């Protein structure tokens, strides 16, 4: 199994070929036809046959390709945060598009009615679940939606924040 993996890596140019890893049992293309006896023979112009010699395969020199920088490195340098003050559930599209593009979203639902705000928060919770992000309550009606690659650091001011965040149903006002 390791031999097959090694040959595949050599074929794809991911590893350099070592002659000790290549066995004689490896099928190779042959330029000469096989005789009925099963041995390979070459027919010369004079009609006599001679045993064909195996010549080493020519391998072109391979230059390794350098990987392009990952887009994750660019995402680590966060430059924008989208703040949305939705007035109705119809504004959910702008929240979803920004979050899907990898931008953290601050969603302030204080201008909405309780039922519509709950519906929008449920949408946001499903959105962050589907895209492996997270949602945090900042204040009673302000939520932070963060993509999976964004880390939110707490500065240790837990005195002002309740230990367990209240849901929209518990908050009046």
From Swiss-Prot:
InterPro entries recorded for this chain? Cell_div_SepF, Cell_div_SepF/SepF-rel, SepF-like_sf
**Compartments it resides in:** Cytoplasm
Q: Which domain of life is it from?
A: Bacteria
Report the Gene3D superfamilies cross-referenced here. SepF-like protein (3.30.110.150)
- Keyword Cell division attached: yes
One BP term from GO? division septum assembly
**Predominant location category:** cytoplasm
Which residue intervals are annotated with compositional bias (Low complexity) in the record?
A: 35-52
Residues covered by region (Disordered): 17-85
What is one term from the GO cellular component aspect held by the record? cytoplasm
**Keywords annotated in UniProt:** Cell cycle, Cell division, Cytoplasm, Septation
Function description: Cell division protein that is part of the divisome complex and is recruited early to the Z-ring. Probably stimulates Z-ring formation, perhaps through the cross-linking of FtsZ protofilaments. Its function overlaps with FtsA.
Assembly description: Homodimer. Interacts with FtsZ.
Q: Tell me its family.
A: Belongs to the SepF family.
Q: What is this protein called?
A: Cell division protein SepF
| Species | Kocuria rhizophila (strain ATCC 9341 / DSM 348 / NBRC 103217 / DC2201)
């Amino acid at each position: 199994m390791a031999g097959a993996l090694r040959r595949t890596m050599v074929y794809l140019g991911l590893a350099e070929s070592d002659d000790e890893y290549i066995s004689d049992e490896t099928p190779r293309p042959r330029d000469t036809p096989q005789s009925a006896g099963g041995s390979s023979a070459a027919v010369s112009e004079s009609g006599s046959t001679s045993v064909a010699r195996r010549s080493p395969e020519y391998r072109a020199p391979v230059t390794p390709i350098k990987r392009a920088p990952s887009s994750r490195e660019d995402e680590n340098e966060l430059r924008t945060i989208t703040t949305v003050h939705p007035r109705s559930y119809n504004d959910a599209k702008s929240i979803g598009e920004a979050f899907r593009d990898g931008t953290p979203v601050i969603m302030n639902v204080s201008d909405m009615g309780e039922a519509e705000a709950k519906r929008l928060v449920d949408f946001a919770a499903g959105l962050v679940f589907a895209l492996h992000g997270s949602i945090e309550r900042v204040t009673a009606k302000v939520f932070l939606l963060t993509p999976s690659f964004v880390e939110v650091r707490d500065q240790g001011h837990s005195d002002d924040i309740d230990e367990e965040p209240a849901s929209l149903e518990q908050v009046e006002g």
